[in-house]
Amino acid sequence: MMTTPELSCDVLIIGSGAAGLSLALRLAEKHKVIVLSKGPVSEGSTFYAQGGIAAVFDETDSIASHVEDTLIAGAGICDRHAVEFVASNARTCVQWLIDQGVLFDTHVQPNGKESYHLTREGGHSHRRILHAADATGKEVETTLVSRAQNHPNIQVLERSNAVDLIISDKIGLPGPRRVVGAWIWNRNKEWVETCHAKSVVLATGGASKVYQYTTNPDISSGDGIAMAWRAGCRVANLEFNQFHPTALYHPQARNFLLTEALRGEGAYLKRPDGSRFMPDVDERGELAPRDIVARAIDHEMKRLGADCMFLDISHKPDDFVRQHFPMIYAKLLDLGMDLTKEPIPIVPAAHYTCGGVVVDDYGRTDVDGLYAIGEVSYTGLHGANRMASNSLLECLVYGWSAAMDIDRRMPSVHSVDVLPAWDESRVENADERVVIQHNWHELRLLMWDYVGIVRTTKRLERALRRITMLQQEIDEYYANFRVSNNLLELRNLVQVAELIVRCAMMRKESRGLHFTLDYPQQLAESGPSILSPLTPHINR
């Protein structure tokens, strides 16, 4: 049944992190914008980002150096054009953030001049990380949220999940294939609403919730990647899942990460006996790229049969540690640990999805009118491994470029007066929610065990067989019962799990974040692993 949509806007932005909100604020002067947030508006990966944002502000640094560092960290398969595009626009986009009211830390130089305090993290050859103490994401997110909520042209819908995108040819509309809106699950009212939009932007973040152990908030369930795939978009490089080397090992704080900046300021990684191991692994020691550090920690844990390794900055002055890492210091103190006095137990945990929906310089996907920006996208910036503090930067740069393109094409986009209403005539209320919980746990455990930091062909094949069975069960459940938040996330996550495994099976080498015992060497030449819904098993 066709009906007038309950919601209508010029631009629907699905996601309320740095990518989505920066885009919304750039567009709102001329266009009506709706921003969807799955939970409270600030509950996303941006809020929890500790490290900072990479940009060239130091006169001894250069854009060329930022580019080169990113290419090296990406292990040979970054898109050089994308890297240069982001690095060359970094300072302008960070300045826009400052103009919005974001306060980065400053310090007084020996010559008496005040400047931004720049820190250094793994993979960077210079100090180029702007930060707000050790809670940069919180400063960025709260500033952008405040501005968005007070803008008359931005409507923020909290506790609202996108169920699926509405694509023109799938609902019988004539003309070129394009996105015309989305169905939205209103968690407060517990029903599905129809939203018309001239442009739709996926800013949903990554898919690290596919793993049992993650530093991400619960909402990181790969929604945008799954929706884009179902809409007909290509995805790429999903085998490259970044495991943050230093998540806190503590039963009461499983999602808490210890920022890379700790190692940037001199923290050591140690075995339980107090000895260091990174100097034996890489000449850069603790400042090696994350894939190398995470694999080294994983190797030591397995070699020693240890539950964790340790991060130690107790050799630095107490005041220095408390001043630079106040949030981490306070959190650990609440848990009975003193960062200034003792080594802190850590383990690797799923942290960032380096692949995603294939886009161009403007965040445009394969479907007309559909954009993807931030962690959900594959721009080519990160290659086989994301360099620290390039993620928030990517959000800002593509939020800027997508805004330009959306604004440019808006006058030529025709509105759609009626869209199909969500049909619940053949479904019933769920009676066995334990099925969802069981599938949740099984999926995340098998991904951790078989598609984790170290992989083999047999593990990947085993994972794919079980994922295929889970997909059948979940699709049947989705077809017969009313939607719920857990069901929507599970449906999306099992789809993304399949895509991760298929990308991993395509790559017959070890490179960056993808390490397989069956192909331990790196090929002389390689490129992205690209999957298309039209030919799902195409090789790169």
Swiss-Prot record:
Cofactor(s) demanded: FAD
InterPro entries to which the protein is assigned, alphabetical: FAD-dep_OxRdtase_2_FAD-bd, FAD/NAD-bd_sf, Fum_R/Succ_DH_flav-like_C_sf, Fum_Rdtase/Succ_DH_flav-like_C, NadB, Succ_DH/fumarate_Rdtase_cat_sf
Documented EC number(s): 1.4.3.16
Predominant location category: cytoplasm
GO biological process: 'de novo' NAD biosynthetic process from L-aspartate
Enzyme class (EC, first level): oxidoreductase
Binding annotation for FAD: 16-19, 38, 45-52, 223, 375, 391-392
Family note: Belongs to the FAD-dependent oxidoreductase 2 family. NadB subfamily.
Protein name: L-aspartate oxidase
GN (gene name): nadB
